[in-house]
Each structure stands twice: as structure tokens, then as C-alpha cells.
UniProtKB/Swiss-Prot annotation:
Superkingdom of the source species: Eukaryota
Protein name: Lipoyl synthase, mitochondrial
Organism, scientific name: Picea sitchensis
Biological or metabolic pathway of the protein: Protein modification; protein lipoylation via endogenous pathway; protein N(6)-(lipoyl)lysine from octanoyl-[acyl-carrier-protein]: step 2/2
Keyword ATP-binding listed: no
GO cellular component: mitochondrion
SUPFAM superfamilies in the cross-refs: Radical SAM enzymes
Positions contributing to [4Fe-4S] cluster 2 binding: C146, C150, C153
NCBIfam families: lipA (TIGR00510), PRK05481.1 (NF004019), PRK12928.1 (NF009544)
Record: residues binding [4Fe-4S] cluster 1: C115, C120, C126, S362
Length: 386
């Protein structure tokens, strides 16, 4: 079944038409999932489906409940007559002592951050410390040039990027430790030009960090490694605490949003492999952009498939066009709609869901929750082994 995104943008979150479209699509998605993968269904999803089968509230009921006539999204206008961004999409201007210190340290160590390369709107908040006072930066390793060209990403691309710096794992680890952080996110460009896709370099960086500061929690936001199981295993067993890989968008929009070498099923398999190879206690995580032209029903179906893959944490954020050369924004999803996805995600059994217009996959707001989850898991594991 196909739902016109323009139609969904015009109608309200709580309308009968949207409820009808949701119900038809979600029943098809749920029934097919139950038939195809019953052994992989999580307890939370099983309970949710049982309620549906027994005439309980549908997923569309869950999403539309209490929103009344609140809109699902705000239009962006046309190319000739663009509308202004909604007030909730206004980002703070970068500044402050911590921001200046981190920027200087990065230049001194010749390090790259995805914050700058991808023009992240949260750069000012994360580097200055925001409400928590804890400054964070997501370090990008394996250089600043990607072998792929996704339509949403501002990182520069090349078929033959410069070779990785062999000293980078040590330089990155020493720089991060000098900042006194307790939680750090490492990410990288895609390196299809390397025999191991850069997985060995990634693993060395994690291992070096753990050697210098064993108690530091390390999240690795990795590429798909072309679905290579050996590469996934190498990183998953490197000593990290969170294995993250982003599916980026719903299955129907993969070829529109991502490079042709990436696809939904390959990314889903990477997350499944990570869960299989990772030691007990390692969390898996993924992220989805909204506002690319997807429908709410497609988002729900994506959430189900991701949860069935055993993923622990999922984040949702608004897609923002980095430059005019990149894919245009289809709509601005409202904070209320993001909140509904957050509640539905928890209902489905995700251990943590970060969902908001300004949320990004490596956004600092979720680190405190994830850190607490990891520490609690380890305490339980330690007490049970006594």
C-alpha cells in the first residue's frame, strides 16, 4: 500500500483519514511480520501484537491518542517560495570557553569531528557543555573523506581518499583521555577502498582508548563494512560498550537518501551480527532521520524490524539539509509527533529512545541514560556471578 506524503502533511495527526491509513498499513505489516519471524519477536512486541489481535488499541491509536488536532508536520514551502523554519529548529550559535578549548585541541592534534564535517546543528550545545555542563565531541576517524556519496551528508567524498594515518588511534585516544570524558563517541567515514573497510583501524582506536582509560565508555558509530561479518566481528569484540550503525531512513527511501552501496537489509544484518558477536552487556543502537518523505506507517514498520533485530537503542531526529546541493527537506515533523514515536518505541521494548527534532545519532543528551544502563547491567551481572 502506498500513502502519499503530501497528503499526510496536509492532514492532522488525529484525523480519521490518518487513522484509517495507519490501521490498514500496520495490520499488513504486523501480520506479515508475525508469520515470517515469530522466533525473533521480542516479548514487548509479542504483547503489543496480542493486544492488537484481541481487539485492543492499534498502533495508530497509540500515535493519535491525546494529540487532538495537532499537526504531524509543518510544510517547507516550494523551491521558489520556501517557508521559514519552525521555531523549534533554531540552533544556538556556537561559543563559550569550552567550545573554544575543544576546537583548539582538535586543531592541535589534527583530529576531525563529525560535528564539523557534517555541519551538525547541535555543535554549539555539545562542545560548550549545554545544560549538563559536560562537553562532548564525536570524533571522526579514518580521515575526513568518504568513499560514498549519500544525499543527506555534507562530508566530502572521493573514490581514492588519502590513506589512514597509522598514528591516528594513539593520537585520538590521548586527546580524548586528556579531555577527562567518561563517555565518547567514535565514528568514521566509509572506506570501501581499504581491504578491511577500516575495521582494523577502528578496533585499534577503541582498544587504545580502553588501555589508557579502562572505565571510559566507548560508543562506536560504524559504517556497514559492506556487510562483511569479519569486519563487524572485529569491531564488535574490540572492547567497545555501544555498537551503533545507522539505517538512516525507512526501507522505501533507501535508494533516494543513501549511496547505492548501502541498503536497509544490509544495515539490519550488520546490527544483527553485532548483537551476535558482541560480549554480553554491549548495547546496539541505530538512528532514523525524519522529514525525508517517509510516511508514519513506514516509520512504525521500520521500528518493528529494528526491534526484531535485537537493537537496544533507537534515535529519531529531523533531517536538515546541509547545503543547497543536498537532498531537500520534505517536511518538518513536530515535537509532539517525535514524542509519540518515543513513547511507541518504549512500548515496543527498546531500552532507550531519543526522539526530537534536534536529536542526532551521536547527540550528547542520550549518553547519560545509556551510561546508566550499562552501569546497571554490569552491577547486575557482577552480583549474579557472586
Amino acid at each position: 500500500m502506498s500513502i502519499n506524503p503530501a497528503f499526510l502533511r496536509r492532514i492532522t495527526w488525529g484525523s480519521k483519514s490518518l487513522h484509517h491509513q495507519f490501521t490498514r498499513c500496520q495490520v499488513r505489516a504486523l501480520s506479515s511480520s508475525v508469520e515470517q519471524t515469530p522466533e525473533s519477536t521480542t516479548p514487548a512486541l509479542s504483547a503489543l501484537r496480542e493486544r492488537l489481535a484481541n481487539g485492543g488499541p492499534t498502533l495508530s491509536d497509540f500515535l493519535t491518542r491525546n494529540l487532538g488536532e495537532e499537526p504531524y508536520s509543518v510544510d517547507v514551502g516550494t523551491k521558489k517560495n520556501p517557508l521559514p523554519k519552525p521555531k523549534w529548529m533554531k540552533a544556538a550559535v556556537p561559543g563559550g570557553d569550552k567550545y573554544t578549548a575543544i576546537k583548539a585541541k582538535l586543531r592541535e592534534m589534527n583530529l576531525h569531528t563529525v560535528c564539523e564535517e557534517a555541519k551538525c546543528p547541535n555543535l554549539g550545545e555539545c562542545w560548550s557543555g549545554g545544560e549538563t555542563g559536560t562537553a562532548t565531541a564525536t570524533i571522526m576517524i579514518l580521515g575526513d573523506t568518504c568513499t560514498r556519496g549519500c544525499r543527506f551528508c555534507a562530508v566530502k567524498t572521493s573514490r581514492t581518499p588519502p590513506p589512514p594515518d597509522p598514528n591516528e588511534p594513539t593520537n585520538v585516544a590521548e586527546a580524548i583521555v586528556s579531555w577527562g570524558l567518561d563517555y565518547v563517541v567514535l565514528t568514521s567515514v566509509d572506506r570501501d577502498d581499504l581491504p578491511d573497510q577500516g575495521s582494523g583501524h577502528f578496533a585499534k582506536t577503541v582498544q587504545k582508548l580502553k588501555q589508557l582509560k579502562p572505565k571510559m565508555l566507548v560508543e562506536a558509530l560504524v559504517p556497514d563494512f559492506q556487510g562483511n561479518s569479519e569486519c563487524v566481528q572485529k569491531v564488535a569484540t574490540s572492547g567497545l560498550d555501544v555498537f551503533a550503525h545507522n539505517i538512516e531512513t525507512v526501507e522505501e527511501l533507501q535508494r533516494v537518501v543513501r549511496d547505492h552501496r548501502a541498503n536497509f537489509n544490509q544495515s539490519l544484518e550488520v546490527l544483527k551480527m553485532a548483537k551476535t558477536y558482541s560480549p554480553l552487556g554491549v548495547l546496539t543502537k541505530t538512528s532514523v532521520m525524519l522529514g525525508c518523505g517517509e510516511t508514519p506507517a513506514q516509520v512504525i514498520e521500520t521500528m518493528e524490524k529494528v526491534r526484531e533485530a535485537g537493537v537496544d537503542v533507537i534515535t529519531f531526529g529531523q533531517y536538515m539539509r546541509p547545503t543547497k546541493r543536498h537532498m531537500a527537506v520534505s517536511e518538518y515533523v513536530t515535537p509532539e509527533a517525535f514524542e509519540k514515536y518515543q513513547k511507541l518505541g518504549m512500548e515496543m521494548g527498546f531500552r532507550y529512545v531519543a526522539s526530537g527534532p534536534m536529536v542526532r545519532s551521536s547527540y550528547k543528551a542520550g549518553e547519560f541514560y545509556i551510561k546508566s544502563m550499562i552501569e546497571d547491567d554490569r552491577k547486575k551481572a557482577s552480583s549474579s556471578s557472586i
